[in-house]
């Protein structure tokens, strides 16, 4: 009995001790926030709400331009609140950030648009993690959590406090030009579940996650970077689909949300009123109806979806009127600050509004460690950022590759012979002109002949090659490579390439691997044996060969519908081939 009483006393002590500690921490946070706020000028209080870009890349020349001198000027003159990292090497960016943070009166909130890790941006020396569509084919949610942790650890190593991820848009439009393979797929439950796991991975290592793009960017036909997309859905329709993942991830405790540039008349019918600058959307729907009180970021204000209709700093004014906390990438910071001050004079805004948003930003800075900021250590930086990427890519590939059709257990899996046999196997590589990892394995493991075709191949060569293959080779392996991620113009896949693959896959012993956006599979749904690989690199290609040989089991399921034959959730589960047992692995659909 004494032990029970003692245990109860200790439990109560721990409980009330935790409450007391939380109160102390809260008091420190409030004290720091108030102290910093009181030290700021009016211009600085407004500038704390702004996130500016550090670099950009020319889409044609691929040349990277850094704006560190310009940003340093904004830090010095206005005490800018945030910086968003884009292209450029990690060491260079880290050195610039160290310099800027040292010069800043108030620690700067560092953000990145790193949906698949910092390698999404720092492409010169950091490998990207798989995109979310490939993750959507995985069935083990712990992998998504571990993925989020790796992305978070990368951010921490780079001195980044906020990652603009995960994307929780439900991609229910296969022709979506801007979200597409950035989404976990078309199923709202999976999008919500995987989004929460990604969020937990980030936030468990001390990086703020950001759900985007509220209220849902998955069913658009226009890229909001170029114009304002229109979604003509009722509130009931939005509530049943698009809003579901946001509601769930809000309840799970996500630190921030990014608001999209969308025109949704059911939310706000004012002409050209994007959801990012709509009070009905941000204050009405997001804050009041859904009850979300975390930090809100606008999508980039340099995008044409809002800039086209609200130029010259007016988009910044409208963003704050709508109820946003942080303004991403206003093109002209001085003009935006001036416009916001004019709006206060005109009583469209108030200094109380600025105080509310500024203190929320400062509180987030305290929460994510900026009150005790340390410089980024650049020693071994790129190696540290890459240290877990390949293992995660391999783990995702082993769990995501999806066998959509398996018509012959005798042919597939295709066990590699002890000694490769000539004129037995041919590999036809579409979209390449030289050996990749898949082609090398086909040569080494099977003694396969390899034919290359680009997407501009003439019909005459295709016809002659098809005839040659039919006469000479018993087994045909086809790989579709290097097509575009975006669905415009059928992913850049030519009719000639479609016809070539269609003819080749009529062979009884043929198998087709599609290395890229799964929506492109619509072109080859009649394949005898068909595998979705989602992305295209050496790791994934080697895993695909292992799957072909029965060395690994197929576990993946389609995250989207690609044609009538293969809908969301399609995928055949296989077992590993046992050479000793002599049994061929049988596949079964789920």
What does each model-found stretch correspond to?
Residues 41, 83, 92-108, 118-120, ...:
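Second-shell residues forming the walls of enzyme active-site clefts
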Residues 47, 53, 71-90, 174-175, ...:
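Short acidic, glycine-rich surface-loop motifs adjacent to enzyme active sites
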Residues 1-23:
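Bacterial Sec-dependent N-terminal signal peptides
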Residues 90-107, 139-157, 354, 359, ...:
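Active-site-adjacent structural elements in enzyme catalytic domains
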Residues 20-73, 279, 288, 310-590:
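Preference for extracellular/luminal or secreted protein segments
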């Amino acid at each position: 009995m004494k032990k029970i009483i003692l245990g109860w006393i200790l439990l109560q002590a721990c409980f009330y001790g935790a409450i007391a500690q939380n109160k102390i921490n809260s008091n420190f946070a409030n004290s720091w926030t108030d102290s910093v706020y009181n030290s700021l000028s009016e211009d600085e209080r407004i500038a704390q709400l702004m996130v500016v870009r550090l670099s950009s890349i020319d889409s044609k020349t691929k040349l990277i331009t850094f704006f560190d001198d310009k940003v340093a000027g904004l830090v010095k003159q206005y005490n800018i609140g945030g910086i968003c990292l884009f292209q450029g090497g990690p060491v260079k960016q880290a050195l610039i950030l160290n310099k800027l943070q040292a010069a800043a009166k108030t620690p700067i909130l560092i953000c990145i648009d790193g949906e698949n890790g910092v390698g999404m941006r720092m492409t010169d020396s950091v490998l990207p993690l798989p995109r979310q569509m490939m993750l959507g084919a995985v069935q083990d949610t712990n992998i998504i959590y571990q993925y989020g942790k790796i992305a978070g650890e990368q951010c921490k190593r780079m001195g980044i406090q906020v990652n603009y991820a995960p994307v929780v848009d439900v991609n229910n439009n296969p022709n979506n030009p801007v979200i597409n393979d950035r989404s976990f797929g078309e199923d709202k439950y999976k999008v919500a579940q995987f989004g929460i796991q990604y969020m937990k991975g980030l936030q468990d290592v001390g990086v703020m996650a950001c759900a985007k793009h509220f209220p849902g960017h998955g069913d658009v036909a226009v890229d909001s970077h170029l114009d304002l997309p229109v979604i003509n859905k009722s509130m009931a329709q939005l509530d049943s689909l698009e809003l579901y993942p946001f509601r769930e991830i809000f309840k799970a405790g996500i630190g921030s949300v990014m608001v999209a540039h969308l025109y949704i008349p059911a939310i706000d019918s004012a002409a050209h009123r994007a959801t990012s600058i709509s009070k009905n959307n941000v204050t009405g729907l997001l804050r009041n109806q859904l009850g979300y009180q975390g930090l809100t970021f606008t999508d980039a204000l340099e995008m044409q979806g809002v800039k086209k209709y609200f130029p010259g700093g007016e988009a910044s004014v409208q963003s704050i009127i709508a109820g946003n906390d942080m303004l991403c990438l206003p093109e002209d910071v001085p003009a935006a600050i001036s416009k916001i001050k004019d709006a206060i004079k005109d009583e469209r805004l108030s200094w109380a509004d600025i105080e509310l948003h500024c203190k929320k930003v400062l509180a987030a800075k305290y929460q994510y460690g900026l009150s005790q900021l340390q410089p980024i250590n650049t020693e071994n930086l790129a190696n540290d950022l890459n240290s877990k990427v390949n293992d995660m890519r391999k783990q995702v590939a082993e769990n995501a590759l999806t066998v959509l059709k398996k018509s012959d257990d005798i042919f597939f899996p295709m066990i590699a012979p002890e000694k490769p046999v000539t004129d037995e196997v041919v590999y036809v590589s579409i979209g390449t002109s030289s050996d990749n990892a898949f082609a090398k394995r086909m040569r080494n493991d099977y003694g396969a002949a390899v034919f290359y075709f680009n997407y501009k191949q003439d019909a005459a060569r295709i016809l002659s090659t098809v005839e040659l293959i039919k006469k000479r080779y018993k087994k045909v392996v086809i790989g579709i490579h290097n097509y575009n991620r975006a669905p415009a113009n059928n992913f850049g896949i030519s009719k000639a390439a479609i016809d070539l693959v269609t003819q080749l896959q009529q062979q009884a012993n043929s198998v087709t691997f599609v290395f890229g956006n799964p929506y492109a599979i619509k072109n080859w749904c009649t394949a005898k044996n068909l595998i979705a690989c989602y992305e295209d690199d050496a790791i994934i290609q080697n895993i695909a060969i292992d799957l072909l040989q029965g060395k690994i089991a197929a576990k993946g399921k389609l995250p989207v519908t690609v044609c009538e034959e293969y809908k969301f959730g399609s995928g055949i589960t296989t077992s590993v081939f046992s050479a000793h047992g002599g049994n061929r692995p049988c596949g079964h659909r789920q």
